[in-house]
């Protein structure tokens, strides 16, 4: 009902140590995605965290302003979203989208050419990430737009973007949902 409060998640608490992998398991609609999105304050405008706190590395991050949150996202905490087509910009190449992650958070220049490879440091890093996540012929895929990739390849691009800045905490919201048959060996 409109105007009525609905509690999506209640009394959630978990602690994740460095290097630890934690899986949040529950039935559909149980609040797994809401819990993940709330950590980075990515909930829709109508949602709110009514009580409690969110701590990362011993500090409360639930009250951070936009600039501090932007710095935290990508640098320290990254997220792999469930549906890459809603997260990737349909008008930009995958190289541009991964490069932006690096430019914003690591201040790597895209201007200087490496005399040995003939590539910029950003392009070298983007290619490295694409190869690591299993994108075949990564160099040929740099200029591809998201709709030109398979669902599995788009998911891999999302994973590459999340890993780009070596985050301390990686949140994955059903990251294998769209992966293709090539990883099911």
PLM feature spans:
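A short, proline-enriched helix->beta-strand linker immediately N-terminal to the Walker B motif
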Residues: 164-168
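Conserved ABC ATPase signature
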Residues: 144-149, 153
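Hydrophobic anchor residue at the start of the ABC signature
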Residues: 98, 159, 170, 183
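ABC ATPase NBD coupling module
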Residues: 61-78, 96, 104, 119
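Conserved ABC transporter NBD signature motif
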Residues: 49-60
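Conserved ABC ATPase "signature" region
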Residues: 60, 114-140
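A short, flexible loop at the N-terminus of ABC-type nucleotide-binding domains that lies
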Residues: 1-11, 42-48, 65-68, 91, ...
